[in-house]
A protein has these predicted regions:
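Short flexible loop/turn segments that cap and initiate beta-strands
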Residues: 64, 72-103, 192-229
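Contiguous beta-strand segments within globular domains
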Residues: 58-70, 178-195
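Sec-dependent signal peptide recognition
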Residues: 2-9
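C-terminal motif of bacterial Sec signal peptides marking the signal peptidase cleavage site
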Residues: 14-17
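Surface-exposed beta-loop interaction hotspot
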Residues: 123-188
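Aromatic sugar-binding surface patches on proteins
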Residues: 107-119, 128, 230
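Hydrophobic beta-strand positions in extracellular immunoglobulin-like domains
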Residues: 54, 70-72, 118-120, 136, ...
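Acidic/polar, low-complexity intrinsically disordered N-terminal segments immediately downstream
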Residues: 20-96, 102-103, 125-127
Length: 230
């Protein structure tokens, strides 16, 4: 993935305490597996329910960071040692294709949560739709589940595809910032090559040149822009 910088934001919980002459009570924040996440939907089979989450509880065209966990329907417990892969597929009227996606890994410091990303390069419409197939293994037993997922068009364009000078198709997606500000913005983009309709590997050793413009004010640019490198 093409990366300029990573910016990490940490939310620090504070410990509140109160005291009286008789006792002292300390209240600590309750931290759960799903802090900061909202459910998108569930994908189910006869054995498990796969819960999908992100920060706003919805998918959209472009980059989507997704967290998931697997609930056993019999025990109501969440699986802690699953190996998971996924495959999003767009069902068009004349063809099917996938999109760029990451591997799924266990979320650091979490017991039941896994995460990855999917970049939907096109939105659904009245006749064409995305589904998401999740394959996973628990205790050497393989399972699969598939469901249609809702992928509307994004309010702002965050992904596009183009043909390179090598006649190959590429997909480029803006990952960060999610909400650009009038200031210096650290930016992260992903660049992928379409090898076939189902395979979109990360492109290495490319530079992404940027040229921000303000069309409503004489199409001016901005100062001190730096091209993106890996």
């Amino acid at each position: 993935m093409k990366i300029l910088k990573y910016t990490f934001l940490f939310l620090l919980g504070t410990m509140l305490s109160c005291s009286s002459d008789d006792d002292t009570t300390t209240t600590q924040p309750i931290v759960t597996e799903l802090d900061g996440l909202n459910k998108i939907q569930e994908i189910t089979n006869d054995t498990h329910s796969i819960e999908l989450y992100n920060t706003n509880g919805a998918l959209e065209q472009g980059y989507n960071g997704i967290s998931l966990r697997i609930k056993n329907k019999t025990t109501n417990e969440y699986e802690q040692n699953a190996t998971i892969t996924w495959n999003p597929v767009m069902h068009m009227t004349s063809m099917m294709h996938s999109c760029p996606k990451s591997e799924i890994v266990k979320t650091a410091t979490k017991e039941t949560l896994y995460n990855g990303f999917i970049i939907f390069q096109m939105a659904q419409n009245e006749t064409e739709y995305w589904d998401l197939k999740v394959d996973y293994t628990i205790d050497n037993v393989a399972y699969t589940a598939t469901a249609v997922v809702n992928v509307p068009a994004s309010a702002k364009q965050r992904v596009t595809s183009f043909t390179g000078s090598d006649s190959k198709r590429y997909i480029i997606a803006m990952i960060e910032p999610n909400t650009p500000k009038v200031a210096v913005n650290d930016m992260t983009f992903g660049l992928f090559k379409m090898e076939n309709m189902m395979t979109f590997p990360v492109v290495d050793n490319f530079k992404i040149k940027i040229d921000p413009r303000m069309p409503s004010m004489g199409n001016h640019s901005s100062p001190n822009n730096v091209d993106l490198t890996q």
